[in-house]
């Protein structure tokens, strides 16, 4: 159900509270998921004119789970705070004295419900952390992370239900990784969606038993960061080592991700240097180039009255990954009506060369390769 449809069914006096929750409500580490409501119902009599829904189920993203809490207002007394039912978490009994925004409920503040939900989620986190005491191993993992502020202050924990047969229970740690994304080139962060939210990397680590014999890590990147780093398949985190600890494993993943970000930033500056060198060496032979991301360059060149194009595609992780050179005849066509072309990646190249050296080496390579390309174009293409 879309937020607008849901809000149209809410009692008008309660609508500001719920609007603040579904339109602006982001609670916890997962900035890509908003709060949402379902199961709208009314406690009013059938004679009460609508819209009159005053109770609903609130879905809250937390540690990879979706908490489902019932929130019950009374449309007849909209100035009163709501009641809460915590669904499957019957053992969760929040401390009323710590719910300051509930105790001092201000019906004139549209955000008062959202503020109470945030306080409840904080207490829910403490409740989940306390459940780890049943496992010395999981408690060790938690306490060692807690000693590091960069991890301890950005962590959510969900302890699963006990297995009735074994007495074991699972646990999931969700951590917001302290990786700086601020220097990623802006062109890579565009056009993902209209409201991308915070740029964030979350590491989820699931312990399927209390002795950590089955541990499954997974990395989640916000949409813009995933796009900037080359897509979901571009980054593979290592398996959790047997006998390993989170306090050792999490920094490894941070280091891996930081290096990936640095590769992207370095690639952008190196591509710009590369294209600047080609502009200098080939001058009027440059037909066009990508002036934003510096990922493409096209040259129009001549060798003994034979004109040809060279399309240069620079990869995201340049200079580590070698550019592709595509030679294209301006005279000859394939059977499908396309200009005859050949792509080359087997040419002299070193990622250690600067842009000027790469341009000089490319110019020398063009002179050696063009004769055989011309011969192939005449042999395989059609005028």
UniProtKB/Swiss-Prot annotation:
<keyword id="KW-0677">Repeat</keyword>
<dbReference type="InterPro" id="IPR010358">
    <property type="entry name" value="BRE"/>
</dbReference>
<keyword id="KW-0963">Cytoplasm</keyword>
<keyword id="KW-0132">Cell division</keyword>
<dbReference type="GO" id="GO:0006302">
    <property type="term" value="P:double-strand break repair"/>
</dbReference>
<dbReference type="GO" id="GO:0010212">
    <property type="term" value="P:response to ionizing radiation"/>
</dbReference>
<keyword id="KW-0833">Ubl conjugation pathway</keyword>
<comment type="function">
    <text>Component of the BRCA1-A complex, a complex that specifically recognizes 'Lys-63'-linked ubiquitinated histones H2A and H2AX at DNA lesions sites, leading to target the BRCA1-BARD1 heterodimer to sites of DNA damage at double-strand breaks (DSBs). The BRCA1-A complex also possesses deubiquitinase activity that specifically removes 'Lys-63'-linked ubiquitin on histones H2A and H2AX.</text>
</comment>
<feature type="region of interest" description="UEV-like 2">
    <location>
        <begin position="275"/>
        <end position="364"/>
    </location>
</feature>
<comment type="similarity">
    <text>Belongs to the BABAM2 family.</text>
</comment>
<dbReference type="GO" id="GO:0070531">
    <property type="term" value="C:BRCA1-A complex"/>
</dbReference>
<keyword id="KW-0007">Acetylation</keyword>
<keyword id="KW-0053">Apoptosis</keyword>
<dbReference type="GO" id="GO:0005634">
    <property type="term" value="C:nucleus"/>
</dbReference>
<keyword id="KW-0597">Phosphoprotein</keyword>
<dbReference type="GO" id="GO:0045739">
    <property type="term" value="P:positive regulation of DNA repair"/>
</dbReference>
<keyword id="KW-0539">Nucleus</keyword>
<keyword id="KW-0227">DNA damage</keyword>
<feature type="modified residue" description="Phosphoserine">
    <location>
        <position position="2"/>
    </location>
</feature>
<keyword id="KW-0131">Cell cycle</keyword>
<feature type="region of interest" description="UEV-like 1">
    <location>
        <begin position="30"/>
        <end position="147"/>
    </location>
</feature>
<keyword id="KW-0498">Mitosis</keyword>
<protein>
    <recommendedName>
        <fullName>BRISC and BRCA1-A complex member 2</fullName>
    </recommendedName>
</protein>
<dbReference type="GO" id="GO:0070552">
    <property type="term" value="C:BRISC complex"/>
</dbReference>
<dbReference type="GO" id="GO:0051301">
    <property type="term" value="P:cell division"/>
</dbReference>
<dbReference type="GO" id="GO:0006915">
    <property type="term" value="P:apoptotic process"/>
</dbReference>
<feature type="modified residue" description="N-acetylmethionine">
    <location>
        <position position="1"/>
    </location>
</feature>
<keyword id="KW-0234">DNA repair</keyword>
<dbReference type="GO" id="GO:0007095">
    <property type="term" value="P:mitotic G2 DNA damage checkpoint signaling"/>
</dbReference>
<dbReference type="GO" id="GO:0031593">
    <property type="term" value="F:polyubiquitin modification-dependent protein binding"/>
</dbReference>
<dbReference type="GO" id="GO:0005737">
    <property type="term" value="C:cytoplasm"/>
</dbReference>
<keyword id="KW-0156">Chromatin regulator</keyword>
<dbReference type="GO" id="GO:0006325">
    <property type="term" value="P:chromatin organization"/>
</dbReference>
<comment type="subunit">
    <text>Component of the ARISC complex, at least composed of UIMC1/RAP80, ABRAXAS1, BRCC3/BRCC36, BABAM2 and BABAM1/NBA1. Component of the BRCA1-A complex, at least composed of BRCA1, BARD1, UIMC1/RAP80, ABRAXAS1, BRCC3/BRCC36, BABAM2 and BABAM1/NBA1. In the BRCA1-A complex, interacts directly with ABRAXAS1, BRCC3/BRCC36 and BABAM1/NBA1. Binds polyubiquitin. Component of the BRISC complex, at least composed of ABRAXAS2, BRCC3/BRCC36, BABAM2 and BABAM1/NBA1. Identified in a complex with SHMT2 and the other subunits of the BRISC complex.</text>
</comment>
<dbReference type="Pfam" id="PF06113">
    <property type="entry name" value="BRE"/>
</dbReference>
